[in-house]
Amino acid sequence: MVRGDMVLLGVVRAPHGVMGLVKVRTFTEDPSHISAYGPLTDGHNCFNVTVVSVLGADSVIAKFDGLSSRTESEKLRGKRLYVSRSSLPRLQEDEFYENELIGMDAKLEDGTAYGVISAILNFGSCDIIELSTSTGKVVMVPFSRSTFPVVDVERRVVIVVPPEVIGVGSR
């Protein structure tokens, strides 16, 4: 079981070759850093991971200690890989881990419930917050101080000021 202080760093996609290597989708800013914070866990087992090569902005080929065949690495397919939050670098004041934001309540400046953060996306220029609104619509809003002036991690709530294009009436 994964504890509440664990942060998701990656997911094993598939075996790579016949020597026990695997493709891993990473959620770290630099994909090669998935192995930089110590052993990873799926909640049951610990894995010492070495990055063999970086495949792109969010994927690596990795070696898990103790795996030497495709058959062994196949068993890791779909495993979610976590690390203790205390192993990660301290964040700056306006930085957040993605898993902290997902599921947070979003309220308007007057306190009216607006929705819940359902996803964080990035299409190149900035992070986009996907909000599932209280009316059932899905709205995408740029993650900036002007649209999210308050992010309260402890209370699990954000204040959202929807851009004029979206408008409050689109709730």
UniProtKB/Swiss-Prot annotation:
A GO BP annotation: ribosomal small subunit biogenesis
Its main subcellular localisation, reduced to a broad class, is: cytoplasm
Which InterPro entries does the record cross-reference, listed alphabetically? PRC_barrel-like_sf, PRC_RimM, RimM, RimM_N, RimM_N_sf, Transl_B-barrel_sf
Q: What would be an example GO MF term here? A: ribosome binding
Keyword field = Chaperone, Cytoplasm, Ribosome biogenesis, rRNA processing
User: Is Signal set as a keyword in this record?
Assistant: no
Q: Which GO terms describe its cellular component?
A: cytoplasm; ribosome
Subcellular localization is given as:
Cytoplasm
Q: Which domain of life is it from?
A: Bacteria
PRC barrel domain sequence ranges: 93-167
Quote any Pfam family the record assigns.
Answer: PRC_RimM
Regarding protein family, the annotation reads: Belongs to the RimM family.
Q: What is known of its domains?
A: The PRC barrel domain binds ribosomal protein uS19.
* UniProt function note: An accessory protein needed during the final step in the assembly of 30S ribosomal subunit, possibly for assembly of the head region. Essential for efficient processing of 16S rRNA. May be needed both before and after RbfA during the maturation of 16S rRNA. It has affinity for free ribosomal 30S subunits but not for 70S ribosomes.
Subunit text? Binds ribosomal protein uS19.
Q: What is this protein called?
A: Ribosome maturation factor RimM
- Annotated source species: Anaplasma marginale (strain St. Maries)
Q: What is the lineage of its organism?
A: Bacteria, Pseudomonadati, Pseudomonadota, Alphaproteobacteria, Rickettsiales
Give the encoding gene's name.
rimM
